[in-house]
């Protein structure tokens, strides 16, 4: 049996082919799995569980089918969908996990994160993250009208694109990649803090398997891929793990 781990699907009505691929993935792989973990950014935008969305409705119904059949489903919020709450979780049949958290995968304690916590060189993003994850901010934000929340979300996305463009203009390609990737010292500190030898995260859209030494211990950091040009899934079982690509329909 296998545990499946994915992230960064960024499901959006403007990219129906990715939703189609995700639903096919559920049909073909999840029904026989030990568990499915979604480590954030399942959706491109999420402004509250009361947000009308045909894509979200379709996804919830599909996930619920497998939850009802006995497959454990877990969701860790990402930077795009950290407002996914208890109402949607109940509809979809998944359990919301804290970021970060440690789970046991076939006897191996494994640290799961979305991944943005490790990108501390991007100071502006970390400040925005701290502001928007504050419980008081969230509570106040969710009292606003849907139109007001949508306007804030659109403005935040424009600001994010402008920030990324600014970083590209102000830095050469090597420095830009460094700023927008994880900070090695933070990775090492996270391993040491949680006392594990394996970490799995998404966010950076740079799928890879990294081997490193932390305090003389051999550690593994797995980076999940995004679902833009293809799908990406990490398959974990008692024998190890494999990163696989999924071809888009058509």
UniProtKB/Swiss-Prot annotation:
**KW Membrane (keyword) present:** yes
| Localization of this protein | Cell inner membrane
- Give the record's pathway: Glycolipid biosynthesis; lipid IV(A) biosynthesis; lipid IV(A) from (3R)-3-hydroxytetradecanoyl-[acyl-carrier-protein] and UDP-N-acetyl-alpha-D-glucosamine: step 4/6
Required co-factors = Mn(2+)
- Function (record text): Hydrolyzes the pyrophosphate bond of UDP-2,3-diacylglucosamine to yield 2,3-diacylglucosamine 1-phosphate (lipid X) and UMP by catalyzing the attack of water at the alpha-P atom. Involved in the biosynthesis of lipid A, a phosphorylated glycolipid that anchors the lipopolysaccharide to the outer membrane of the cell.
Q: Which GO terms describe its molecular function?
A: manganese ion binding; UDP-2,3-diacylglucosamine hydrolase activity
Q: What class of enzyme is it?
A: hydrolase
Tell me the cofactor note.
Binds 2 Mn(2+) ions per subunit in a binuclear metal center.
Protein residues bound to substrate: 79-80, 122, 160, 172, 175, 203
Its predominant location is membrane
Keyword field: Cell inner membrane, Cell membrane, Hydrolase, Lipid A biosynthesis, Lipid biosynthesis, Lipid metabolism, Manganese, Membrane, Metal-binding
Any one Gene Ontology BP term: lipid A biosynthetic process
Binding residues for Mn(2+) 2: 41, 79, 114, 203
Q: Any keyword Cell membrane? A: yes
**What Enzyme Commission number(s) appear in the record?**
3.6.1.54
Q: Which HAMAP family match?
A: LpxH
- Protein family according to the UniProt entry: Belongs to the LpxH family.
Per the record, membrane topology reads: Peripheral membrane protein
Organism (species): Xylella fastidiosa (strain M12)
Catalysed conversion reaction: UDP-2-N,3-O-bis[(3R)-3-hydroxytetradecanoyl]-alpha-D-glucosamine + H2O = 2-N,3-O-bis[(3R)-3-hydroxytetradecanoyl]-alpha-D-glucosaminyl 1-phosphate + UMP + 2 H(+)
Its recorded name reads UDP-2,3-diacylglucosamine hydrolase
Q: Where does Mn(2+) 1 bind?
A: 8, 10, 41, 205
Q: Which domain of life is it from?
A: Bacteria
Q: What Gene3D superfamilies would the database entry show?
A: 3.60.21.10
> What cellular component terms from Gene Ontology apply here?
cytoplasm; extrinsic component of plasma membrane
């Amino acid at each position: 049996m296998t545990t499946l781990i994915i992230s960064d699907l960024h499901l959006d009505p403007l990219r129906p082919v990715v939703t189609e691929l995700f639903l096919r993935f559920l049909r073909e792989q999840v029904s026989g799995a030990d568990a499915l973990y979604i480590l954030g950014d399942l959706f491109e935008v999420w402004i509250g569980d009361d947000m009308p969305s045909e894509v979200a409705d379709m996804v919830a119904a599909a996930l619920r089918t497998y939850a009802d059949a006995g497959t454990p489903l877990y969701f860790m919020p990402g930077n795009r969908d950290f407002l996914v709450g208890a109402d949607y979780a109940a509809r979809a049949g998944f359990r919301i996990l804290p970021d970060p958290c440690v789970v046991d995968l076939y006897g191996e304690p494994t640290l799961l994160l979305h991944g943005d916590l490790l990108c501390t060189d991007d100071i502006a993003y970390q400040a925005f993250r701290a502001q928007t994850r504050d419980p008081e901010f969230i509570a106040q934000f969710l009292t606003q009208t849907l139109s007001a929340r949508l306007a804030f979300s659109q403005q935040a996305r424009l600001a994010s694109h402008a920030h990324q463009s600014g970083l590209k203009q102000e830095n050469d390609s090597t420095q830009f990649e460094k700023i927008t990737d994880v900070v090695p010292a933070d990775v090492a500190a996270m391993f040491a803090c949680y006392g594990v030898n394996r970490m799995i995260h998404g966010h950076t859209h740079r799928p890879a398997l990294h081997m490193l030494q932390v305090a003389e211990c051999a550690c593994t950091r797995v980076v999940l891929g995004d679902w833009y040009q293809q799908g990406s899934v990490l398959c974990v079982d008692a024998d190890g793990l494999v990163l696989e690509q999924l071809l888009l329909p058509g």
